[in-house]
From Swiss-Prot:
Location, primary (coarse class): secreted
Residues of the VWFC domain: 32-90
Residues in Fibrillar collagen NC1 domain copies: 1253-1487
Name of the featured protein: Collagen alpha-1(II) chain
Gene that this sequence comes from: COL2A1
Chain positions with 5-hydroxylysine modification: 190, 287, 299, 308, 374, 419, 452, 464, 470, 527, 542, 608, 620, 1130
Disordered: annotated segments: 96-1234
């Protein structure tokens, strides 16, 4: 045996270690690491815990072995290197290098028997052995982690067999040499190669070629060969063990829907889509009307008995039947398209084993089963690409030696090539048995390592030689007896999926799962094969000869031809009615791979199979298609909110909103009446003295000065310039009323008034010419329901009314009687797929339908059982065509053939041409209100038509979509007063008017702006008090001032009346499917549908058993139409047909019970702003606001009471004089000058420090009180006198509710009002704010007169104002003060009428029936007459009796504040039984 030299061995060892490390690197993640002596080793690590021991980590287990050293007898000076176990020979040996000798013959087998060497370390990897016999089936892998859910893949073609797994663990101990000793001991590069073992003799002459030795052990791994040609595909091998989990699938389908999003806005209808594939069958509809009988179809030829059709799509699970007997295995069906995964059902009982489906993608590993018995060897699979070294196989028994071949010329083997680069070392195979012993060769010269020599006397096992060239394969020996089982190898890495295994027996039928959710619509399934032929019917009357059919009718029977090619797809047939559910069919072909079930019951072990032959290597297959869709993932996170839904209906009236932001300045109003004089202002702070002016005219009388020494009488000075106006003085006592002045010039236009309360809608007038679009009025409040009046005689038919508003949906009425059947409508487009209903009970058998068109010729069925047949004779030659035979009698029907293979799924047909329009259907129920259309372009106004005769009133139509806006019409009547507009921008300045007549002397004007301070003049001498001068003339009117800055935004208007009901919202998201209802009663047989389209031809089925050979006749002439056979017995129930396309929608069923409320939709986007609501109720007082900013320092208060006298102090130094002006004002009642004004900054501290702390506190308190008097907050604790005061003190504040106390004094009687901070108006709310709408007054008298509501009508009342919580007369007292403090008042009221005239009597054309209004000073305010006592009408909707509610809005403004507020109203046109009214009272506003 030849020893390896150190360098070669070192190379091998290096490669071996590299391979071990590489494998180790590959497996670190896969297998567990090991711990020994506290040191952690990765899987496949090799280490030496001590010099003579070597260990390896194998998947978490430490395997150790002792190193056995080789005997070094022949070494003169063996040395053991430090840290090593075995000695090495250190003598340098010469290395002769000769030419390689010729290759020796194979030696004889040695006869070492059963000598087991010590366990060698893993040898270098041998070349790939020939494919060994198939190993036993491995244990089932452990369950892998579930992969992410993939999308439904298309069913892939089965992948090629996967590559072999990674190398297995080291094999059992080998026979033969001790390679470990060398490995463990290391190699000395200087050692010679040849002399490491037995001394080598000289090379003998080449012997004759020996007989082929027994098969050697697999050699080390060879280099990778070039890929061979792809082999023929082998027969499918048995199903391999489950492969490792596949790569993560494509992202899974989205998780189950989050909670339904809130409904989005309804999109515009899309275009009509192409015809969809049939949806899941809907729930059974109400039975339709019987259809019209179809036309007689042309009689089809009798088809050959069709092959039994493929099972139809599985029906919904029926209620579980009794467990049937185990069925025969069905034929293997083609894989159907994958359905969508249903929701997981409850675990059923284990069913009988179903036929195996095609190999699905790798599922998650199942639970490990018990190991099955070893199966028989499957047929050879296609050869996979060369894999990594497999686990060690069992050693085969040696074959018997073949006969010796003739000695070949040495040239057969060729010169050994240069040594190739080392292959990746494999783990050593088991050592082979020793070859037969060769004769000893003569001693050769020491050449380079020669080929293998003869085996010498059995010596100590040598090292393994280098791989020689591969010998030619010997003939296969007989199969040896199975060797003993090797140690169990390490589990290999998971192989790729094997080819499809042979079909297993069908599983037991599982219990039905829960109903899944409807899957996505599948593609249209293939047309099923024709069902079994029913027995013959009773003889019918002879039909007329039909037109020639598409295929020729059969002549005399020829020999059965081969199956023809598929024909073209027939035209799309119309949808037939669904048949009655069939009985359970035979087990269908396997469906697509289902979701993985729970592990089944363990099967019995199968018998062991025979070993297959090795197949050729196939090319690596493409990756398989992604697997089926997995089970639904966990619920996804809630999705983002959906898009905003459509606007919801208008909400209930909200609470009073916060005041809106200020608007822009409005345009100036028309000139108002002249204002009354302003109130006297408070006294202002005196300015500093001006420069001495020219001597002015005698001034007004001043306050008496301190008495001076009497001076001499001065001369009267000239009239001085007017001084700057002082600040407002305190309020003077009211003087006697002066005579009314002459009418002044018209004032500037006032701001627009507050928006009045919304009026009631007037009755619909006659349709006028189209007006220009008027301003939109505020919607009125809905009236209370009136009493039902007696039915009047029918009036002349009015013009068609405008379309009314959509009423709220009424409650569902009871179901009406069934109407007469309408004419058959056009088939509607298929409705959306409903949820699958439970199968109905079996219906009564329908009448026999007309014979359908002939289907494509089915594949040949197996011949029916005829009588016992004789042995088939040889086939005769084709005979001559015989004459046409006489018509034979109809033969008995043949037995049912087997099902043909299913045809392919046809492509969806193109959309058919639209059919002709059907006759108009009966009118449908009112649909929901359509979405608002886009505004169309304005049409041009048509000429007014002649007035037609009035038609009868139409029924209330369904609200149409909003039409396009028409062109602007002529201006309509005056709309309701709008909300008070925002103050407009100032208009252009008008020209100066002529001076008016002198007015009465006004009250002092408002405080002017203080003038600029003049320089301080020298004090004049104190003069004596002068006499009172005559009153000066009034100055002439000043020129208009510069334009003021724009005013602030107007107050938010009073909330308008409740808007009309909004349009019906978009339908909510569909509720979850209801639980299935109970099965309905058996419906009547539906009418026969029209023939379905001919499906495409299925692929050719396997050829049937050969029929009895007949003489092959040429095709016979067309036979005559056969007579109808007798009516046969009822056939077996056919298999369930394929699912038909959806039928036309049935008539709507009765309204179902309301489903459970769906989940609330998402909050819709804010709806369009509704019309203003009604006046809100007074809000509750807000919380006390935060403390205001610190007020200004108050002026010094009056001196406090004198303190107790202190003890006399020591005399101080003479002090400076005190500035007496600091205390000059303390004793006066009016405000004196601000002492702090005269202090210098450096004096203040010194002077103030002397004040007593008590005085300081008092001053501070007084200061705060004075500040609150000077600048009230409008809170309950610190009310203002009027809103105008608040506006002056806090111009930045917004309009809203504030507290005022016009009579000042105690604040407990303050009242809450609305302050319009744009105008300064104070508005007091009425209480109550409305008079209910009803019939208040009945009178038989024909004479109509005004009836005062508060005074005369039973239940009437005078209108009152202010808070509920004020004492009864408090509001009146406060109102009296408020009138005195104001110069103008205004108020709106709205009169709601039904058959009552409010202002203009349209019939009479006059105002005689107009309302009267009573002011608070009992003055009557009328519709006509003196303009001071007349009201204005903003909108008049009560001009005639229409039987509907209308409203008239009235406004009264006056500068005589004593006339407001309005306290009573007197309608005239009331008293009849159908005459009703109500009143909305607006707030009264004073300015």
């Amino acid at each position: 045996m030849i020893r390896l030299g150190a360098p070669q061995t070192l190379v091998l060892l290096t490669l071996l270690v590299a391979a071990v490390l590489r494998c180790h690197g590959q497996d670190v993640q896969k297998a567990g690491s090991c711990v020994q002596d506290g040191q952690r080793y990765n899987d496949k690590d090799v280490w030496k815990p001590e010099p003579c021991r070597i260990c390896v980590c194998d998947t978490g287990t430490v395997l150790c072995d002792d190193i056995i050293c080789e005997d070094m007898k022949d070494c003169l000076s063996p040395e053991t290197p430090f840290g090593e176990c075995c000695p090495i020979c250190s003598a340098d040996l010469p290395t002769a290098s000769g030419q390689p000798g010729p290759k020796g013959q194979k030696g004889e087998p040695g006869d070492i028997k059963d000598i087991v060497g010590p366990k060698g370390p893993p040898g270098p990897q041998g070349p790939a052995g020939e494919q060994g016999p198939r190993g036993d089936r491995g244990d089932k892998g452990e369950k892998g982690a579930p992969g992410p859910r993939g999308r439904d893949g298309e069913p892939g073609t089965p992948g090629n067999p996967g590559p072999p797994g990674p190398p297995g663990p080291p094999g059992p101990p080998g026979l033969g040499g001790n390679f470990a000793a060398q490995m463990a001991g290391g190699f000395d590069e200087k050692a010679g190669g040849a002399q490491m073992g037995v001394m080598q003799g000289p090379m003998g002459p080449m012997g004759p070629r020996g007989p082929p030795g027994p098969a050697g052990a697999p050699g080390p791994q060879g280099f990778q060969g070039n890929p061979g040609e792809p082999g023929e595909p082998g027969v499918s091998g048995p199903m391999g063990p489950r492969g490792p989990p596949g790569p993560p699938g494509k992202p899974g389908d989205d998780g189950e829907a989050g909670k339904p999003g809130k409904s989005g806005e309804r999109g515009p209808p899309g275009p009509q889509g192409a015809r969809g594939f049939p949806g899941t069958p809907g729930l059974p509809g109400v039975k339709g009307h019987r259809g019209y009988p179809g036309l007689d179809g042309a009689k089809g030829e009798a088809g050959a008995p069709g092959v039994k059709g493929e099972s139809g799509s599985p029906g919904e699970n029926g209620s579980p039947g009794p467990m049937g007997p185990r069925g025969l295995p069905g034929e293997r069906g083609r894989t159907g398209p994958a359905g969508a995964a249903g929701a997981r059902g409850n675990d059923g009982q284990p069913g009988p084993a179903g036929p195996p489906g095609p190999v699905g993608p790798a599922g998650g590993p199942g639970f490990p089963g018990a190991p099955g018995a070893k199966g028989e060897a499957g047929p050879t699979g296609a050869r996979g690409p060369e894999g990594a070294q497999g686990p060690r196989g069992e050693p085969g028994t040696p074959g018997s030696p073949g006969p010796a071949g003739a000695a070949g010329n040495p040239g057969t083997d060729g010169i050994p090539g240069a040594k190739g680069s080392a292959g990746a070392p494999g783990i050593a195979g088991a050592p082979g048995f020793p070859g037969p012993r060769g004769p000893p060769g003569p001693q050769g010269a020491t050449g380079p390592l020669g080929p293998k020599g003869q085996t010498g006397e059995p010596g100590i096992a040598g090292f393994k030689g280098e791989q020689g060239p591969k010998g030619e394969p010997g003939p296969a020996g007989p199969q040896g007896a199975p060797g003993p089982a090797g140690e169990e190898g390490k589990r290999g890495a998971r192989g790729e999926p094997g080819g499809a295994g042979p079909a297993g027996p069908p599983g037991e039928r599982g219990a039905p799962g829960n109903r899944g959710f409807p899957g996505q619509d599948g593609l249209a399934g293939p047309k099923g094969a024709p069902g079994e032929r029913g027995p013959s019917g009773l003889a019918g009357p002879k039909g007329a000869n039909g037109d020639p059919g598409r295929p020729g009718e059969p002549g005399l029977p020829g020999a059965r031809g081969l199956t023809g090619r598929p024909g073209d797809a027939g035209p799309q047939g119309k949808v037939g009615p669904s048949g009655a559910p069939g009985e359970d069919g035979r087990p269908g072909p396997p469906g697509p791979q289902g979701a993985r079930g729970q592990p089944g019951v363990m099967g019995f072990p199968g018998p062991k199979g025979a070993n297959g032959e090795p197949g050729k290597a196939g090319e690596k297959g493409l990756p398989g298609a992604p697997g089926l869709r997995g089970l639904p993932g966990k619920d996804g996170e809630t999705g983002a909110a959906g898009p905003p839904g459509p606007a919801g209906p208008a909400g209930e009236r909200g609470e009073q909103g916060a005041p809106g932001p200020s608007g822009f300045q409005g345009l100036p109003g028309p000139p108002g009446p002249p204002g009354e004089g302003g109130k006297p202002g408070d006294q202002g702070v005196p300015g500093e003295a001006g420069a001495p002016g020219l001597v002015g005219p005698r001034g007004e009388r001043g306050f008496p000065g301190e008495r001076g020494s009497p001076g001499s009488q001065g001369l009267q000075g000239a009239r001085g310039l007017p001084g700057t106006p002082g600040t407002d003085g305190p309020k003077g006592a009211a003087g006697p009323a002066g005579p009314p002045g002459a009418q002044g010039p018209p004032g500037l236009q006032g701001m627009p008034g507050e928006r009045g309360a919304a009026g009631i809608a007037g009755p619909k007038g006659d349709r006028g010419d189209v007006g220009e679009k008027g301003p939109e009025g505020a919607p009125g409040k809905d009236g209370g329901r009136g009493l039902t009046g007696p039915i009047g005689p029918p009036g002349p038919a009015g013009a068609n009314g405008e379309k009314g508003e959509v009423g709220p949906p009424g409650p569902a009425g009871t179901a009406g009687a069934r109407g007469a059947p309408g004419e058959r409508g056009e088939t509607g487009p298929p409705g959306p797929a409903g949820f699958a209903g439970p199968p109905g009970a079996d219906g009564q058998p329908g009448a026999k339908g007309e014979q359908g068109e002939a289907g494509q010729k089915g594949d040949a069925g197996a011949p029916g059982p005829q009588g016992p047949s004789g042995a088939p004779g040889p086939q005769g030659p084709t005979g001559v065509t015989g004459p046409k035979g006489a018509r034979g009698a109809q033969g008995p029907p043949g037995a049912t053939g087997f099902p043909g293979a299913a045809g392919r799924v046809g492509p969806p047909g193109s959309n058919g041409n639209p059919g002709p329009p059907g006759p108009p259907g009966p009118s449908g129920k009112d649909g929901p209100k359509g979405a608002r259309g886009d505004s169309g372009p304005p049409g041009r106004a048509g000429d007014p038509g002649l007035q037609g005769p009035a038609g009868p009133p139409g029924e209330k139509g369904e609200p149409g979509d909003d039409g396009p806006s028409g062109p602007d019409g002529p201006p309509g009547p005056q709309g309701l007063a709008g909300q008070r507009g925002i103050v407009g921008l100032p208009g252009q300045r008008g020209e100066r008017g002529f001076p008016g007549l002198p007015g009465p002397s006004g009250e002092p004007g408002k405080q002017g702006a203080p003038g600029a301070s003049g320089d301080r003049g020298p004090p004049g001498p104190v003069g004596p008090p002068g006499l009172t001068g005559p009153a000066g003339e009034p100055g002439r009117e000043g020129s208009p001032g510069a334009d003021g800055p724009p005013g602030r935004d107007g107050a938010a208007g009073v909330k308008g009346d409740r808007g009309e009901t909004g349009a019906v919202g978009a339908p909510g998201a569909p509720g979850p499917p209801g639980s299935p209802g109970p099965a309905g009663p058996i419906g009547k047989q539906g009418d026969r549908g029209e023939a379905g389209a001919q499906g495409p031809m299925g692929p050719a089925g396997p050829a049937g058993a050969r029929g009895m050979p007949g003489p092959q006749g040429p095709r016979g002439d067309k036979g005559e139409t056969g007579e109808a056979g007798e009516r046969g017995l009822k056939g077996h129930r056919g298999f369930t047909g394929l699912q038909g396309l959806p039928g036309p929608p049935g008539p709507s069923g009765d309204q179902g019970a309301s489903g459970p409320a769906g989940p609330s939709g998402p909050r819709g986007p804010p709806g369009p702003v509704g019309p203003s609501g009604k006046d809100g109720a007074n809000g509750i007082p807000g919380p006390i606001g935060p403390p205001g900013p610190r007020g200004r320092s108050g002026e010094t208060g009056p001196a406090g009471p004198p303190g107790n006298p202190g003890p006399p102090g020591p005399p101080g130094p003479p002090g400076p004089g005190i500035d007496m002006s600091a205390f000059a004002g303390l004793g006066q009642r009016e405000k004196g000058p601000d002492p702090l004004q005269y202090m210098r900054a450096d004096e203040a501290a010194g002077n103030l420090r002397q004040h007593d702390a008590e005085v300081d506190a008092t001053l501070k308190s007084l200061n705060n009180q004075i500040e609150s008097l000077r600048s009230p907050e409008g809170s309950r604790k610190n009310p203002a006198r009027t809103c105008r005061d608040l506006k002056l003190c806090h111009p930045e504040w917004k309009s809203g509710d504030y507290w005022i106390d016009p009579n000042q004094g105690c604040t407990l009687d303050a009242m809450k009002v609305f302050c319009n901070m744009e105008t300064g108006e104070t508005c007091v709310y009425p209480n109550p704010a409305s008079v209910p709408k009803k019939n208040w007054w009945s009178s038989k008298s024909k004479d109509k007169k005004h009836i005062w509501f508060g005074e005369t009508i039973n239940g009437g009342f005078h209108f009152s104002y202010g808070d509920d919580n004020l004492a009864p007369n408090t509001a009146n007292v406060q109102m009296t003060f408020l009138r005195l403090l104001s110069t103008e008042g205004s108020q709106n009221i709205t009169y709601h009428c039904k058959n009552s005239i409010a202002y203009l009597d349209e019939a009479a054309g006059n105002l005689k029936k107009a309302l009267l209004i009573q002011g608070s000073n009992d003055v009557e305010i009328r519709a006509e007459g003196n303009s001071r006592f007349t009201y204005t009408v903003l909108k008049d909707g009560c001009t005639k009796h229409t039987g509907k509610w209308g409203k008239t809005m009235i406004e009264y403004r006056s500068q005589k504040t004593s006339r407001l507020p309005i306290i009573d109203i007197a309608p005239m046109d009331i008293g009849g039984p159908e005459q009703e009214f109500g009143v909305d009272i607006g707030p009264v506003c004073f300015l």
